[in-house]
Amino acid sequence: MQTYTYSSIPAQCFLGESPYWSVERQSFFWVDIENGKLFEHQLDSGKTTIKSFPHRLTLVLGGEGGELILALDRKIASFDLSTEKLAWLTEVESDLPLNRFNDGKCDAKGRLWIGTLSTKFTKGSGSLYRVGKDLKPEKQLDQLTISNGMAWTADNQTFYFIDTPTRQIKAYHFELETGEIEFNRVAVEISEELGFPDGMCIDQEGMLWVAHYGGSGVYRWNPTTGELIEKIELPVPHVTSCAFGGSNMDTLLITTAQENLSKDQLKEYPLSGDVFLVKTETRGEEANRFVY
């Protein structure tokens, strides 16, 4: 397997997540969920800025008008970076105060797919929603525990999805026009010693780059054969998500976490919670934006 080199961006996130590449701004965004922080790192200047919100901030991605789309607790909002104005768009599970949003992405039609979990991590308490132009969340999957990473194939015929505790990446038939999904097969089974699958992204070769929580790296899996192809080894235990970006879409931004680490472990792994940049030999695609 290839050996990768990395550079790190000091962030010290308790729970870093949701890396997103903004083409217009040529910068990476990510969040620190429990601390409600939104980070922006300009790739050329190396400058990092932080904005804080009085909510758990679980997701950042792009809207069709250049605004950001944020998930805060159980609500989705648009955020104008120039005015810093937040506009609420929709909400789910208002009757489940222990639940919050987790990971999310947009499909090629601009629909937002976003999952929930219980902050107590109660088994089966999470769901996966699809949100279209009418801003009405429609439940697609239920009985989830930690709704997490997702990706679509280039032909838009397969949707990959992770419910973290299952240690599986599932493949669903995907119908682009309607947004319907139907379970097809388990694409990847992840053994216990490799940790838990968390966030993921897909490259132009159709391979899945998966952050392994408790697995000290990002693992590249072949979802057709289920085989592990390679691994980006990182000096932290809890790797949470990854996304392609940069001018050539060949830079992987990787988020990590400090949660569930003791004081001694944090001394042993001081870069936990920081963000890592890794150049790869494969490229990703620009993330789809939310159309509403």
Question: Where are the language model's segments positioned?
Answer:
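Hydrophobic/aromatic beta-strand positions that recur at structurally equivalent sites within the blades
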Residues: 31, 41, 79-81, 129-131, ...
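Hydrophobic alpha-helical segments and helix pairs
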Residues: 85-142
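Conserved beta-strand positions in repeat-built beta-propeller and related beta-rich domains
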Residues: 22-23, 28-33, 69-74, 112-122, ...
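Blade-level signature of beta-propeller repeat domains, shared across WD40, Kelch, NHL, RCC1
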Residues: 243-292
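A short beta-strand motif characteristic of beta-propeller blades
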Residues: 4-10, 46-52, 87-94, 136-142, ...
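Beta-rich, blade/repeat-based domains predominating
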Residues: 11-25, 54-69, 95-111, 140-158, ...
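A short loop-to-beta-strand structural motif that recurs across blades of beta-propeller domains
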Residues: 37-39, 75-77, 126-129, 168-170, ...
